[in-house]
C-alpha cells in the first residue's frame, strides 16, 4: 500500500529532531541546531520484510527501533531582514510517530518477522517541495538542512513546534545582518500555514497506515501460531537451523551497525553523500531480507515433502516382508541340514564298523576259497591214482591168467605189487591231506556263518535295546498323524484314538514296537494291532494346539512364524503334545513338509449362510505334526500367490478360524490349550466360547498372543456375521467394537476380551502398549484385562545361530576359544576391502531393514561418528522406502573406496553370519521394537550391543555402566532418547571400554556369549501359564 503526500514539509532554520531511548524511554524533545541552508525534503515510509523464522525468537526479546526521518529543504533568497517577533504565532502541529507499528520516513523499519504470507507494504512515496523563488529575493541565500528523527513515543505527543519559535529562529539570522522585507515575511507566514495543513494531512495518512499495520500484525500473530506448529515438525532440518543461527548472528551484527547509525544520525549531517551511503546500506538490508524469505519458502516446501513420508512408510514396509521371509527360510534350511549332518555322522561311524567286519570276513572267505581250490586239485590227483589202480588191478587179473606161464611174469607181478603198495601209501597220505583241507574249509565256513549270525543278533539286539526317547520327533509326529487320519476317516473310534494318541504322547515302547512290526503290513492288520494296545493310562503333559497364519519355515513372513515353530518345538521337548493348524497356501515351501498327504475325508464348515467342504492335509514340519486346511470355497481364499495383502483378508482368516475349530470338533480332539496368534486367528476366541463350547468342544483354555499391536485387522461390523458370529451382540464397546468408529469391529480387541491368557513378545512392550501412544486404541482394554495380560520375551533358534558349528564362518569359535572371532574379523575386512593395518580398531556392525522404525537417522549418524572415534563401520540391509534407499545409495557411493566404511544395501544370509561373528560392537537404535532378535544373535556371536531402551531391547540389553543392574546381567550399552546426543553417549562409552582394557573386554565377550537366549526359558513361562489356567478350569467345571 502506497500513499502519496502532495504537501510541503517545512522545517525551521536550524531545527533538528533527536530520537530518545529505545522502547520505554521518555517523550522526545526538539532542539535548535544551527544550519546554513534549506534543502528539499524527502519523506518515505516502507514496511520491510521480516527476518528468517529461525531468528524470530531472538528478535522478540527486544522491540525494534523504527526511525522516522524527515528531510525538509526550503530554498529561499533573502534580500532584506524582517522583524519576526511581531508576526503571527500560529502553531505548527508536531509530527507523531508510533515505533511499535514500525513506520519510517526516509528510513526503514525492520519488523523482524519471517512470515512469507505477509506481503503488504506501506510506502509513503517521496514528496519534494521547493518553494518558488521570489522575484525580489536576493541571489544570495543559505540552505538550511534539518532532520527530524522521531523515535519511540509510547503513545505520548511530541512537543509542538510553534510559529513564535520559527520567528525566534529567523531573528537569529537578522542579528547576523540578513534583511527580510515585510512582503517576504508575509509570504513566509503563508507558507508556514500551508505547511501546517500538509502536516495534518501527513498525520492522517500515517494514522491510516498504522491501522493497516495493526491488521497486518494481527495476521502475523495468526501465522505465528502456524509457524510454531511447523517448527515442531522440522526435526530433520537441524542442519538448516544451525545455518539460520549463523545468519542470526549476522543479523545481530547488522542491528548493531544500525544502532551505531542511529546514534550517528543524532548529530548534524553535514553532507548529502552521507545520506546516500546510508540509503545504499538500507537497500542492502532489503536484499538480505529477500534472501531470507526465499530460504523460508524452501524450508516450507521440504516440510510438505516430510508430511507425505509417513503415509508411504506403511505401504512400502510391506514390500520388505518378502526379504524377511527368505531370511527365515534359509535359516530353517540350515537347521534341517545341520540335523541331517548330525544323523549322517552317526550312520557313517556305524557303516565304517560294518565295513571293517565285512572286510575281515572277506579275507577269511578268500583264504577258505584258496584252501578249497587246493583240496580240489588233491582230489583230482587222487582220482587219477584211483584210475591207475583200477588199470593195475585189471592188469593183475590178466597177469594171474599167465601166472604160471613164466617166471618173468611172476617177478613182474612182485614188482607191480610193490608199486601198488607204494601207491596205496601215497593215496592214504593224500586222503589224509584232503581230509585236513576239507575240515579246515568247513571250520572256516562255520566260523563265517557264526560271525554273520552274531552280527544279525547284534543288529537286532541294538534295534530292540535302542531307547524310544532317542527316536526323532518326525517319527512320533508321523505316528500321531496316522492315528488322527484313521479317526477322521472313521476307521477307529474316538475313545480308541484318544488312548492311542496318549500312548504316542508318552512315547510308549509298546506302540513303537507295534508300529515297527506292522510297518510293512496292510492298513487293516495295522489298525488291528494298534487296537490291541488300547489301555487307559493317565497323561502328565498338556495337549496344545496352535492355530496360526504362519509357521517357519514353510509359511513365514515375519517373527510370528518363528514363534510358532520355536515355541512348539520347545514345548514338545518338555514332553507336551503339540499340534499346529495352518492354511494350505499355494505359495508355501512344500519341500519343507515331510510325508505330506491328503486324508480321505472332508470337514464342512459354515460361512456366509452355507456349508463349505475343506480338504485336510497332514505332514510334519521341524518334527511337529501339522494339519493343513484347504478350503473348497469358490473364492480360493489361500490360492492367491501370497500370504497377506488381499482386499478380503478379514473374510479369508475368519473362514480359516472357524474351519480350524470345526476340524478339532469333528476329529474328537480334546486339547487343553488352543493358542491363537495375531489378528488373523483372533476370531478363534469368540467363536470358541459362543459357538463351539456349547457343541462339546469345551476342554480347552484360549491363549492369544499379539506380536505387534500396529496391526489389528479392523473391518466393517457387517463382515463379522459371515463366520456365524452375532454382530449385534459383539459390536459393542465392551466386546469387539473398535474405538475409531461405532460400525467397525476389532478382532484383536475381541481376542483380548474372550481369551483366558493374553501375551505379547516382551515385558517392556507389554507396558508400552498399555499407554495411549503404544496401545493404538487398545490401551484401555488391556488395562481393564491386565490380570491376564503378560509379556514374554521371544527366544532364538540356537541351533541355527551357533558360532561353534556355523558353516558360513571362516573359523568356528566359542566362549572359551575366541581366536576364531579374530580370524572372521580379518576375513571380513579382506572380503570387503577394508583396512587391516590396525587389528585392534573396533568394527561396528549393523544388520537391519532401513525403515523409520529402525532409527535410520541414527544409523546414518553412526557411520560418521564411528569414523570420528577411530572405528570401522559395516552396514547390511536395504530399504523399501525409495527416498531412504536413494539417500543411503548416495552414502554408499561416498564411501565406496573408503578404508573404514562399507555399506551393502541388500540382504545376504552368509554375509550376515560373518558380520555378526566379526563385529566388536553392534548397533540397534530402534525407535520402536516389540521384541527384536538381532541383539540376541549379536551377543551369541560375541558382539556387544548398543541399543535404545525400548520394547524387547530393554528386556535383553542391560548397560554395563548402570550400577542399579547386577553385574551378572550387564551385557551392553543403552541410551534412552532417540537423538544423536543420547546415541553418541552410548557409542563413546563403548569405544572407551574397548580401547581402555582389552582383558576386561574379552571377559565381557565371553559373558555375553554364554547367555542363554534359546526358547527354553520362554517355553517354561508359557508352560506355567498353561498349567495355571488349566488347573483353574478343572477346579471350576462350569467355566465360562
UniProtKB/Swiss-Prot annotation:
EC numbers on record: 2.4.1.21
GO molecular function, one term: alpha-1,4-glucan glucosyltransferase (UDP-glucose donor) activity
Cell compartments where the protein resides: Plastid, Chloroplast; Plastid, Amyloplast; Plastid, Chloroplast stroma
Region (Disordered): 43-142
Catalytic activity: [(1->4)-alpha-D-glucosyl](n) + ADP-alpha-D-glucose = [(1->4)-alpha-D-glucosyl](n+1) + ADP + H(+)
Chain residues that bind ADP: 556, 559, 562, 849, 854, 906, 908, 916, 933-934
Principal location: plastid
Gene3D superfamilies: Glycogen Phosphorylase B (3.40.50.2000)
Coiled coil start-end: 187-466
Gene Ontology biological-process entries: starch biosynthetic process; starch metabolic process
Family the UniProt entry places it in: Belongs to the glycosyltransferase 1 family. Bacterial/plant glycogen synthase subfamily.
Protein name: Probable starch synthase 4, chloroplastic/amyloplastic
Record lineage: Eukaryota, Viridiplantae, Streptophyta, Embryophyta, Tracheophyta
Amino acid at each position: 500500500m502506497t500513499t502519496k503526500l502532495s504537501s510541503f514539509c517545512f522545517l525551521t532554520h536550524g531545527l533538528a529532531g533527536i530520537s530518545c531511548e529505545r522502547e520505554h524511554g521518555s517523550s522526545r524533545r526538539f532542539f535548535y541546531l544551527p544550519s546554513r541552508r534549506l534543502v528539499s525534503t524527502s519523506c518515505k515510509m516502507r514496511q520491510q520484510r521480516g527476518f528468517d523464522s529461525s531468528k524470530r525468537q531472538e528478535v522478540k526479546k527486544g522491540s525494534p527501533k523504527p526511525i522516522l526521518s524527515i528531510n525538509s529543504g526550503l530554498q529561499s533568497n533573502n534580500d532584506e531582514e524582517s522583524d519576526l517577533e511581531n508576526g503571527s504565532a500560529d502553531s505548527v502541529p508536531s509530527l507523531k510517530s508510533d515505533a511499535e507499528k514500525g513506520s519510517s520516513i526516509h528510513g526503514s523499519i525492520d519488523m523482524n518477522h519471517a512470515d512469507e504470507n505477509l506481503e503488504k507494504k506501506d510506502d509513503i512515496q517521496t514528496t519534494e517541495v521547493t518553494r518558488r523563488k521570489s522575484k525580489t529575493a536576493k541571489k544570495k541565500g543559505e540552505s538550511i538542512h534539518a532532520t527530524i528523527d522521531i523515535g519511540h513515543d509510547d503513545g505520548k505527543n511530541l512537543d509542538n513546534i510553534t510559529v513564535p519559535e520559527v520567528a525566534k529562529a529567523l531573528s537569529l539570522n537578522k542579528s547576523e545582518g540578513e534583511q527580510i522585507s515585510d512582503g517576504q515575511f508575509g509570504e513566509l507566514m503563508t507558507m508556514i500555514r500551508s505547511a501546517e495543513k500538509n502536516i495534518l494531512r501527513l498525520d492522517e495518512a500515517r494514522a491510516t497506515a498504522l491501522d493497516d499495520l495493526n491488521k497486518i500484525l494481527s495476521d502475523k500473530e495468526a501465522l505465528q501460531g502456524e509457524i510454531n506448529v511447523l517448527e515442531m515438525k522440522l526435526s530433520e532440518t537441524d542442519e538448516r537451523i544451525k545455518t539460520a543461527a549463523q545468519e542470526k548472528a549476522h543479523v545481530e551484527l547488522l542491528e548493531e551497525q544500525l544502532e551505531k547509525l542511529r546514534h550517528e544520525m543524532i548529530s548534524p549531517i553535514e553532507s548529502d553523500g552521507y545520506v546516500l551511503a546510508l540509503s545504499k546500506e538500507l537497500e542492502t538490508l532489503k536484499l538480505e531480507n529477500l534472501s531470507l524469505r526465499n530460504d523460508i519458502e524452501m524450508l516450507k516446501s521440504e516440510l510438505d515433502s516430510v508430511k507425505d513420508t509417513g503415509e508411504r512408510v506403511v505401504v512400502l514396509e510391506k514390500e520388505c516382508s518378502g526379504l524377511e521371509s527368505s531370511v527365515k527360510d534359509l535359516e530353517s534350511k540350515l537347521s534341517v541340514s545341520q540335523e541331517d549332518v548330525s544323523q549322517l555322522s552317526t550312520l557313517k561311524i556305524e557303516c565304517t564298523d560294518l565295513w571293517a567286519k565285512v572286510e575281515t570276513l572277506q579275507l577269511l572267505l578268500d583264504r577258505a576259497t584258496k584252501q578249497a581250490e587246493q583240496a580240489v586239485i588233491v582230489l583230482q590227483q587222487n582220482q587219477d591214482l584211483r584210475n591207475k589202480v583200477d588199470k593195475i588191478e585189471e592188469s593183475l587179473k590178466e597177469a594171474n591168467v599167465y601166472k604160471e606161464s613164466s617166471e618173468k611174469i611172476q617177478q613182474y607181478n612182485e614188482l607191480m605189487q610193490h608199486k601198488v603198495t607204494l601207491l596205496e601209501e601215497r593215496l592214504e597220505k593224500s586222503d589224509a591231506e584232503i581230509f585236513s583241507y576239507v575240515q579246515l574249509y568247513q571250520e572256516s565256513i562255520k566260523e563265517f556263518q557264526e560271525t554273520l549270525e552274531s552280527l544279525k543278533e547284534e543288529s537286532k539286539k541294538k534295534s530292540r535295546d535302542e531307547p524310544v526317547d532317542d527316536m526323532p520327533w518326525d517319527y512320533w509326529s508321523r505316528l500321531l498323524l496316522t492315528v488322527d487320519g484313521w479317526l477322521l476317516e472313521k476307521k477307529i473310534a474316538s475313545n480308541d484314538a484318544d488312548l492311542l494318541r496318549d500312548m504316542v504322547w508318552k512315547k510308549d515302547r509298546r506302540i513303537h514296537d507295534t508300529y515297527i512290526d506292522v510297518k510293512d503290513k496292510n492298513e487293516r492288520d495295522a489298525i488291528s494291532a494298534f487296537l490291541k494296545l488300547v489301555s487307559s493310562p493317565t497323561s502328565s503333559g498338556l495337549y496344545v494346539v496352535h492355530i496360526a497364519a504362519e509357521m517357519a519355515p514353510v509359511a513365514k513372513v515375519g517373527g510370528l512364524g518363528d514363534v510358532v515353530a520355536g515355541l512348539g518345538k520347545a514345548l514338545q521337548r518338555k514332553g507336551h503334545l503339540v499340534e499346529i493348524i495352518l492354511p494350505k497356501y499355494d505359495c508355501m515351501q512344500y519341500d519343507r513338509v515331510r510325508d505330506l498327504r491328503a486324508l480321505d475325508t472332508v470337514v464342512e464348515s459354515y460361512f456366509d449362510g452355507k456349508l463349505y467342504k475343506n480338504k485336510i492335509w497332514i505332514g510334519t514340519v521341524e518334527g511337529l505334526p501339522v494339519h493343513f486346511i484347504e478350503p473348497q470355497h469358490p473364492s480360493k481364499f489361500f490360492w492367491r500367490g501370497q500370504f497377506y495383502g488381499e482386499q478380503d483378508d478379514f473374510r479369508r482368516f475368519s473362514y480359516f478360524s472357524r474351519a480350524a475349530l470345526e476340524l478339532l470338533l469333528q476329529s474328537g480332539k480334546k486339547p487343553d490349550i488352543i493358542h491363537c496368534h495375531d489378528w488373523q486367528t483372533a476370531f478363534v476366541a469368540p467363536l470358541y466360547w459362543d459357538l463351539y463350547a456349547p457343541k462339546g468342544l469345551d476342554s480347552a483354555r484360549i491363549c492369544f498372543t499379539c506380536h505387534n499391536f500396529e496391526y489389528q485387522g479392523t473391518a466393517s461390523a457387517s463382515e463379522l456375521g459371515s463366520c456365524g458370529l452375532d454382530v449385534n451382540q459383539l459390536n459393542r464397546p465392551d466386546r469387539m467394537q473398535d474405538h475409531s468408529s461405532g460400525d467397525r469391529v476389532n478382532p484383536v480387541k475381541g481376542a483380548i476380551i474372550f481369551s483366558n491368557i493374553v501375551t505379547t513378545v516382551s515385558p517392556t512392550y507389554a507396558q508400552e502398549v498399555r499407554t495411549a501412544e503404544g496401545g493404538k486404541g487398545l490401551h484401555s482394554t488391556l488395562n481393564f484385562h491386565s490380570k491376564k495380560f503378560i509379556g514374554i520375551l521371544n527366544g532364538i533358534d540356537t541351533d541355527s545361530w551357533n558360532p561353534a558349528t556355523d558353516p558360513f564362518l571362516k573359523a568356528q569359535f566359542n566362549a572359551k576359544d575366541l581366536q576364531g572371532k579374530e580370524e572372521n574379523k580379518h576375513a571380513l575386512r579382506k572380503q570387503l576391502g577394508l583396512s587391516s593395518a590396525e587389528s585392534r580398531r573396533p568394527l561396528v556392525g549393523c544388520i537391519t531393514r532401513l525403515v523409520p522404525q529402525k532409527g535410520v537417522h541414527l544409523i546414518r549418524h553412526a557411520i560418521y561418528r564411528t569414523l570420528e572415534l577411530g572405528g570401522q563401520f559395516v552396514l547390511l540391509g536395504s530399504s523399501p522406502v525409495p527416498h531412504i534407499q536413494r539417500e543411503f545409495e548416495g552414502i554408499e557411493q561416498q564411501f565406496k573406496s573408503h578404508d573404514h566404511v562399507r555399506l551393502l544395501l541388500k540382504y545376504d544370509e552368509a554375509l550376515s553370519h560373518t558380520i555378526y561373528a566379526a563385529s566388536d560392537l553392534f548397533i540397534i537404535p530402534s525407535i520402536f521394537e516389540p521384541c527384536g532378535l538381532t541383539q540376541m544373535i549379536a551377543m551369541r556371536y560375541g558382539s556387544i550391543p548398543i541399543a535404545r531402551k525400548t520394547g524387547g531391547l530393554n528386556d535383553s540389553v542391560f548397560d554395563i555402566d548402570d550400577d542399579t543392574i547386577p553385574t551378572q546381567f550387564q551385557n551392553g550399552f543403552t541410551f534412552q532418547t532417540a537423538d544423536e546426543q543420547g546415541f553418541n553417549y552410548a557409542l563413546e562409552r563403548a569405544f572407551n571400554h574397548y580401547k581402555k582394557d582389552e582383558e576386561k573386554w574379552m571377559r565381557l565377550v565371553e559373558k555375553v556369549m554364554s547367555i542363554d537366549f534359546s526358547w527354553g526359558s520362554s517355553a517354561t513361562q508359557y508352560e506355567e501359564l498353561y498349567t495355571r489356567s488349566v488347573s483353574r478350569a478343572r477346579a471350576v467345571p462350569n467355566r465360562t
